Amino acid sequence: MNKALVWLITLLFLIFSATPNRVLAHPPYISPKTRAREGVWDHKIMKVRKIGVGASNSGHSPGAGGIP
């Protein structure tokens, strides 16, 4: 009987102590239109910020019908 009572009290404590934390940790709602605009903005910025990168120095891997 004591084990069940301790278990029940512990369970209730954990449930009610976690509720405010869940509410605070919940991410704010962002409408799909806002996210789409941010994505377009990010895409435009990435077009502007292209960086020139040289070719790779890695060799070819041996493959079926490839360069040995």
Swiss-Prot record:
GO terms of molecular function: LRR domain binding; receptor serine/threonine kinase binding
Keyword Transmembrane (UniProt): no
Keyword vocabulary terms for this entry: Apoplast, Cell membrane, Cleavage on pair of basic residues, Membrane, Secreted, Signal
Localization per Swiss-Prot or TrEMBL: Cell membrane; Secreted, Extracellular space, Apoplast
Function: Brassicaceae-specific phytocytokine (plant endogenous peptide released into the apoplast) perceived by MIK2 in a BAK1/SERK3 and SERK4 coreceptors-dependent manner, that modulates various physiological and antimicrobial processes including growth prevention and reactive oxygen species (ROS) response regulation.
Record's protein name: Serine rich endogenous peptide 22
Keyword tRNA-binding: no
Signal peptide: 1-25
Location of the motif SxS motif essential for MIK2 binding: 56-58
Recorded superkingdom: Eukaryota
Placement of sequence motif SCOOP motif: 50-64
Subunit structure: Interacts with MIK2 (via extracellular leucine-rich repeat domain); this interaction triggers the formation of complex between MIK2 and the BAK1/SERK3 and SERK4 coreceptors, and subsequent BAK1 activation by phosphorylation.
Organism whose genome encodes this protein: Arabidopsis thaliana (Mouse-ear cress)
Family of the protein in this entry: Belongs to the serine rich endogenous peptide (SCOOP) phytocytokine family.
GO CC annotations, alphabetized: apoplast; plasma membrane
Chief localisation class: membrane
